[in-house]
Amino acid sequence: MAVHQYTVALFLAVALVAGPAASYAADVGYGAPATLATPATPAAPAAGYTPAAPAGAAPKATTDEQKLIEKINAGFKAAVAAAAGVPAVDKYKTFVATFGTASNKAFAEALSTEPKGAAAASSNAVLTSKLDAAYKLAYKSAEGATPEAKYDAYVATLSEALRIIAGTLEVHAVKPAGEEVKAIPAGELQVIDKVDAAFKVAATAANAAPANDKFTVFEAAFNDAIKASTGGAYQSYKFIPALEAAVKQSYAATVATAPAVKYTVFETALKKAITAMSQAQKAAKPAAAVTATATGAVGAATGAVGAATGAATAAAGGYKTGAATPTAGGYKV
């Protein structure tokens, strides 16, 4: 899933942010292009326009485009809240129905108050096309998935798209995964260093295996290393909701991939989640304590590598299930 999100972010950075130079002319303070006989000069900002707010404050929407994207973001959050209250198999259709209603209302209100003029029309058309592209990309990412996984795929893609679009308009949007991870209860963060160490052990074991066996070796090694580094209390790591969701999402991302690339997909997806958690933990406690915990975990987990590699065909313990049902982890709002 993380691999997919990185791809989405790169694609959207080009497809959604790129566009005609005059797309956001009003926002950056320039008027219509000057004629050949007249040098181009900056125009005065539109009435009521204010620059982006300082870091840490939520920028206030002032332009029509900013107001529209804020309404879209509000609809997104309302849809996530609605989906949270229904069974997993109904989350996707609930989200789509709720978000669709909110989006249609936002667009209708925008059209009813749309200012006249070629520049404004061009700017609104560009924003509308970007939002349309975001919806289509999110829908495409969810095609062919199970009802449970479809919701996660759709929301993950759409949240990235809205975040990038809102960023170009200097207004707040859905929080990125790295920020959301910080919401993990402090009491559970002590396990993250051990999980990080287990990941490194499993990756080392997988790197020495043939391409077609890397995924299976990594699964078995990761499972055994988790057990070793937590003193046998394997289930304790499952009490970290974000990690549990990340593991399931990472596994779901590999279902339709070839054996030779399954390992890369899974490893990259899980690495992103664990790295974000580790960074959040390091910011929350002294560096010395982090180093001591991580070093001890690596030593305990290393002993599991030999056995894990020899049992490359073993099932992936507690986190590999017959039908992965990822939960909305990194893109909670």
Swiss-Prot record:
Record keywords: Allergen, Repeat, Signal
Pfam assignment, any one: Pollen_allerg_2
InterPro entries assigned: Poa_pIX/Phl_pVI, Pollen_allergen/Os
Intervals holding Sequence repeats: 309-320, 321-332
Known tissue expression: Pollen.
Disulfide bonds: none
Highest taxon above the source species: Eukaryota
Region (2 X 12 AA tandem repeats): 309-332
Signal peptide (residue range): 1-23
Note: Its C-terminus might be membrane-associated.
Family recorded in the similarity comment: Belongs to the Poa p IX/Phl p VI allergen family.
Protein name: Pollen allergen KBG 41
Source organism (scientific name): Poa pratensis (Kentucky bluegrass)
